[in-house]
């Protein structure tokens, strides 16, 4: 039995992973995590929770929701001291880049954080395979919201609102602290059903994403290739 563990930064990354895995052939979701046919985050209660499994029971996929990047070190310590460290074959991290601070890009800062924690768990279990995907594209600063925005089918709306945000930012009373989230909220306000968060949008409006978009395929292929 192969066991793969995905460690996600937050609810948005968990829902994105769920949607991608849920469209993968021969995978079955743990129906204890569902409510009215969709994923319910509050049902992910255990430290490491069974997420999906394949039809012949040769693969189990587990999930851990960090609920914030600052919880990564605590997770690593708990994982190192758990019996699961000997059972898991591969551990994969999906996290935001975020943005530059001082001389460090958000991507470099997040990559260093992940690699430091990979080093810790590999010291305890050298055979544990590891990997990571840092949104939006595993090389640039940004967030999972950027990945979703750039993969939407409504490209004309996306480009229009991106330009609007740039203009609004210049208004004296504008208080835009997170451009990606502000852009995302304005775009989702044009869609039906209207959803105010990335996780809720993924839950109800996943069909509005272009699955063949190169940026989306990059994370989709990372996930699917790592469970082969």
Segments (PLM) and residue ranges:
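Activity-critical C-terminal alpha-helical subdomain
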Residues: 89-189
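Hydrophobic, Leu/Ile/Phe/Ala-enriched alpha-helical segments that form helix-helix packing faces
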Residues: 21-25, 79-83, 114-125, 152, ...
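Short flexible/disordered coil segments
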Residues: 62-70, 129, 157-161, 192-206
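Charge-rich, solvent-exposed alpha-helical interaction surfaces
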Residues: 43, 47, 62, 110-113, ...
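Structured mid-to-C-terminal alpha-helical surface segments
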Residues: 182-228
């Amino acid at each position: 039995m192969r066991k793969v563990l995905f460690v996600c930064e937050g609810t948005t990354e968990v829902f994105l992973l769920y949607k991608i895995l849920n469209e993968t052939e021969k995978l079955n979701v743990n129906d204890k995590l569902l409510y009215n046919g969709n994923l319910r985050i509050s049902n992910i209660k255990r430290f490491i929770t069974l997420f999906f499994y394949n039809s012949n029971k040769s693969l189990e996929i587990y999930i851990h929701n960090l609920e914030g990047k600052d919880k990564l070190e605590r997770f690593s310590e708990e994982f190192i001291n758990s019996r699961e460290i000997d059972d898991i074959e591969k551990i994969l991290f999906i996290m935001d880049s975020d943005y530059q601070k001082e001389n460090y890009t958000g991507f470099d800062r997040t990559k260093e954080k992940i690699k430091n924690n990979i080093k810790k768990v590999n010291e305890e279990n050298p055979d544990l395979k590891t990997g990571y995907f840092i949104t939006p594209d595993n090389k640039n600063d940004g967030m999972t919201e950027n990945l979703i925005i750039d993969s939407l089918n409504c490209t004309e709306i996306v480009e229009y609102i991106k330009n609007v945000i740039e203009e609004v930012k210049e208004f004296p009373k504008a208080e835009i602290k997170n451009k990606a989230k502000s852009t995302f909220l304005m775009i989702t306000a044009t869609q039906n059903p209207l959803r105010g968060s990335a996780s809720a949008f993924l839950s109800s409006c996943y069909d509005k994403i272009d699955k063949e978009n190169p940026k989306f395929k990059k994370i989709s292929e990372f996930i699917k290739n790592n469970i082969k």
